């Protein structure tokens, strides 16, 4: 059932080519000096050719008006952004896909009771009559306004519905939205004139097609408008206002275009009469343009009635000394395009881009090549430097390129991962990029496809991964911190991870180790902002969409990292896909997880999925006991018991504040306030203390090893951490007993997947990563690629990635240690 609600009230009728890119209304002159036109060079192509993982499913709950989010089979996610709406809010207030397939129904607006055709599922009710006629031929309505129109003195041409099936494969089957538009044609409504309509997600696009020179150049259109008053704005614009004098619709006639792409703005739109709901308009196309001996037919004039939607990606075409901000858009030996994102898709702090691709479709690809011997058109992408005083300037280096050829001419794609990362690094400041084929187009002109298709494909696909857990395939720089703690900074992400050891049992019969892990990316865990205790590991169910794809369970490990488990095709088990060998099976009253040499038992998901026991291959077992839903004790394989104590919060919940060890010694846990769960200190039985200090974003800026007594608190050592605006650690400094500064290291993160570490002596080491953050190489201060370091550290990547002490292990800084890192 269609919901006749327009969520954005301002609606426009554009007599313009509606391409896949909706643009701002202003235009500006562009004078392109020779020095700013730097022709293509393949000496430094920066694009990335990594193939995307396969799409598992769409995460429907993450939909927006013009985006979809997909889960990939490697655990990453793909955000697909479209240049037109693909979803609307249905009666259940859910984002539903448009289905503009036309179906027949009895006419409500036809005097002769012929059949009307209406779209299936949309927030706009759109009807098209069976025959061309002077009134109520096209009707669009919502809950408040309606507008209909027809052409005077037309032939009664029958509607012809064009079903345009599209062959799709691999990820395109998920990202392409079918039935997004319907196409119909009324042939020969006038002599040598066709009317073509596209029912789209924003309304109706109309083409007046002049098939040869023996045609009229004047058209009379009769509108019926409900609760609206028309006013002539200028020679080519008519605006429709409601009773509050607010513009609701706009009729605009900016240009027309012939088959070769020669455009003209010599169109005139004028009000002839207005009486109540009846509005009569005359559209005049320039006679000389229409009947020129140089004209290539057909000529297309493009009226449109839509609800206003602005894409985040817009284009300007540069040609000669001017820039055009409306279609059609051409790539040739003297036309190129400036593309820019108005707004970057939002990513959370722990999410990192793996890939960013920009997709463009060609309308006239098959006509560009007569046969296979024709040379391809190489289309290049360059970084835009800026537009100043009407002059477009861009880098000569090629970011990426694609080609159009005789056998492959329907689209081109740019991998602009590095450039997109740079935009995110610059605080969402987007300069854009230039698309050109100046060197190879020769006399050919490529025309970007308009958004008048039955299916929609994304213009942008961004693949990213959530790195909020402690990733085993990433490398870290590590320093001993506090008491029995380590602080490590991810070389790729720049987040700070603190691992605080609270207890480590001994013996061979399944001893227990208790860790508290802080991650600066995660600020909302229940036991302290960014903190997670190893005994909090649990099993959770996924949402409905993931479950339908076979991902029924999430295993959250001792460091708070989530592992999605997929159902096996051959047996009733769920398997991890990250190579860690995790296997889950469901029993009547519990869940069993095989994790290496350990078998873990968890409570049912209905009871919280809490861990109940762990058993090693020799049958030794650790048991976990709960009181009123909170873990109260842990018993190791030798029968030693660790007890946990809690303190209440104002909201009635509890948080851990004490760990009682098997010898009855106690570790106290302190928080900064009763409401904000930032752990301020772990105080051990010998009064050695790990103390932590935070900024306003709950990120640790300082840790101290203290010796706390009743009389005073003595600081033994400390480390300070400085962050940039993106939450990445950019400097680590160590201090001794007397607050004397020891070694420090500065860290610089670049959008080209490199990180540079520089110590106080100015020695630099450069780490290079792939797009997934896996370490590929290390270039030392002497300019050599390292496979081993003098510290004995092996430079590896993947599951064998390393940690490394970067600062001298010294509490008395009479010297600066070895200055190695």
Regions found by a protein language model. Give the residues of each.
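Intrinsically disordered, low-complexity segments enriched in small residues
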Residues: 1, 5-14, 18, 28-96, ...
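Residues that cap or anchor secondary-structure elements
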Residues: 31-308, 427, 453-454
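A short beta-strand-loop element at or near the start of a globular domain
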Residues: 200-210, 314-367, 497
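Residue-level detector of buried hydrophobic side-chain packing
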Residues: 208, 219, 301, 342-344, ...
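Short proline/glycine- and polar residue-rich coil/turn motifs
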Residues: 273-277, 333, 403-410
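Proprotein-processing/basic-patch segments
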Residues: 328, 421-468
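Beta-strand-rich interaction/scaffold domains
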Residues: 364-429
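Extended charged/polar low-complexity repeat regions
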Residues: 500, 514, 520-522, 529, ...
């Amino acid at each position: 059932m269609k919901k006749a609600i327009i969520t954005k009230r301002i609606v426009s009728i554009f007599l313009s080519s509606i391409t896949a890119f909706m643009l701002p209304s202003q235009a500006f002159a562009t004078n392109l000096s020779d020095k700013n036109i730097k022709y293509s060079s393949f000496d430094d192509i920066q694009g990335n050719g990594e193939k995307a993982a396969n799409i598992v499913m769409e995460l429907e709950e993450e939909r927006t008006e013009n985006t979809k989010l997909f889960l990939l089979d490697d655990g990453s996610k793909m955000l697909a952004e479209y240049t037109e709406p693909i979803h609307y809010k249905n009666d259940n207030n859910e984002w539903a896909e448009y289905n503009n397939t036309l179906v027949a129904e009895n006419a409500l607006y036809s005097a002769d009771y012929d059949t009307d055709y209406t779209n299936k599922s949309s927030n706009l009710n759109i009807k098209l009559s069976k025959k061309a006629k002077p009134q109520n031929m096209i009707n669009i309505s919502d809950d408040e306004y309606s507008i209909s129109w027809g052409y005077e003195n037309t032939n009664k041409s029958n509607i012809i519905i064009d079903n345009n099936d599209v062959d799709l494969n691999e990820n395109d089957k998920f990202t392409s939205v079918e039935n997004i538009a319907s196409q119909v044609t009324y042939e020969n409504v006038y002599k040598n004139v066709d009317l073509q309509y596209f029912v789209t997600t924003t309304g109706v696009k109309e083409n007046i097609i002049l098939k040869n020179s023996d045609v009229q150049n004047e058209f009379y259109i009769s509108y019926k408008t409900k609760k609206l008053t028309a006013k002539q704005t200028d020679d080519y614009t008519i605006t429709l206002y409601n009773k509050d004098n607010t513009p609701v619709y706009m009729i605009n006639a900016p240009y027309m275009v012939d088959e070769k792409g020669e455009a003209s703005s010599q169109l005139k739109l004028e009000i002839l009469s207005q009486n109540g709901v009846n509005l009569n308009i005359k559209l005049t196309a320039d006679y000389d343009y229409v009947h020129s001996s140089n004209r290539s037919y057909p000529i297309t004039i493009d009226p449109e009635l839509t609800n206003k939607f602005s894409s985040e990606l817009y284009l300007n075409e540069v040609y000669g000394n001017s820039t055009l901000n409306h279609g059609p858009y051409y790539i040739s030996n003297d036309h190129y395009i400036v593309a820019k994102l108005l707004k970057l898709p939002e990513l959370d702090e722990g999410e990192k881009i793996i890939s960013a691709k920009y997709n463009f479709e060609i309308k006239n690809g098959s006509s560009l090549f007569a046969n296979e011997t024709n040379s391809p058109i190489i289309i290049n992408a360059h970084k835009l430097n800026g537009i100043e005083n009407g002059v477009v300037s861009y880098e000569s280096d090629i970011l990426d390129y694609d080609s159009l050829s005789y056998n492959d001419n329907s689209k081109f794609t740019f991998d602009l991962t590095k450039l997109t990362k740079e935009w995110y690094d610059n605080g969402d400041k987007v300069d854009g990029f230039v698309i050109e084929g100046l060197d190879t187009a020769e006399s050919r002109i490529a025309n970007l496809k308009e958004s008048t298709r039955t299916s929609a494909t994304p213009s942008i696909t961004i693949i990213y991964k959530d790195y909020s857990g402690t990733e085993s395939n990433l490398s870290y720089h590590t320093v001993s911190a506090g008491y029995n703690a380590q602080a490590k900074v991810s070389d790729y992400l720049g987040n700070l991870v603190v691992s605080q050891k609270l207890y480590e049992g001994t013996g061979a019969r399944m001893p227990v180790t208790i860790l508290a892990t802080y991650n600066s990316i995660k600020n909302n865990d229940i036991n302290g902002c960014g903190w997670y205790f190893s005994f909090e590991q649990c099993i959770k169910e996924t949402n409905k969409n993931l479950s339908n794809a076979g991902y029924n369970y999430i295993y959250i490990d001792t460091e708070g990292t989530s592992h999605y488990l997929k159902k096996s095709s051959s047996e009733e088990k769920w398997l991890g896909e990250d190579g860690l060998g995790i296997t889950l099976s469901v029993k009547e009253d519990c869940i069993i997880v095989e994790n290496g040499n350990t078998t873990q038992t968890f409570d049912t998901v209905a009871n919280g999925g809490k861990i109940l026991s762990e058993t090693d291959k020799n049958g030794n077992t650790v048991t976990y006991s709960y009181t009123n839903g909170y873990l109260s004790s842990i018993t190791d394989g030798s029968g030693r018991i660790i007890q946990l104590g809690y303190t209440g919060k104002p909201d009635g919940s509890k948080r851990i504040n004490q760990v009682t060890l098997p010898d009855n010694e106690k570790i106290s846990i302190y928080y900064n306030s009763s409401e904000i769960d930032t752990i301020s200190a772990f105080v051990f039985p010998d009064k050695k203390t790990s103390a932590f200090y935070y900024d306003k974003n709950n990120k640790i800026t300082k840790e101290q090893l203290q010796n706390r007594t009743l009389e005073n608190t003595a600081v033994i050592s400390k480390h300070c951490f400085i962050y940039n605006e993106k939450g990445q650690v950019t400097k680590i400094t160590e201090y001794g007993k007397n607050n004397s500064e020891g070694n420090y290291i500065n860290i610089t993160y670049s959008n080209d997947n490199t990180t540079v570490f520089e110590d106080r002596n100015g020695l630099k080491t450069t780490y290079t990563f792939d797009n997934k953050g896996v370490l590929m190489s290390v270039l030392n201060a002497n300019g050599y690629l390292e496979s081993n370091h003098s510290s004995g550290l092996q430079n590896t990547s993947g599951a064998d990635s390393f940690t490394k002490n970067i600062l001298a292990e010294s509490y008395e800084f009479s010297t600066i240690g070895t200055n190695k890192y």
